[in-house]
Amino acid sequence: MEYNKKTGKWESPYWHPALTTDAVVFGFDKEDGSLQVLLIKRGKAKPGETPAFEGYWALPGGFIQKDEPTDECVHRELFEESSMRLFNNDKGIQPEFIEQLKTYSARGRDPREFVVTVAYYALVKKDKYIIKGGDDAAEARWIPVDRVGELAFDHSEMLKKALTIINQAIK
């Protein structure tokens, strides 16, 4: 840390990228047996924000808050954007499977700025949840993985990686 005499504050000499989390959430449809993924439709940017993939389907996720661990951020974003609550902080239990998938940091993966994301994947009993879009998600919906089209950002890559891991685990 270095002291900045102009601002009167201690500052890091290192540049810091924006940090986000994204979640690839899978569930089986009991009626047709298909593997489905939870997607959100990105809403319009708020006034003053740079638009990024408005109207595109994406994985639920978003920016980390100050002093927030990534494990908490992914749960908060899932709840804010889809109403899915996988973790109950009051009881300290985690009833569903969720695990880190990979960290993504390619230049240009987000048109707004340099963003590093910690991606997670989860397996849930989807009938336990009533899904609805919230926060900056215009809509939330379960979509069969074989019907997913182009996704925002590099979310198609994340979905593909999570599917590969699941396929390897069940073979």
PLM features: residue spans?
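Unchanged
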Residues: F63-I170
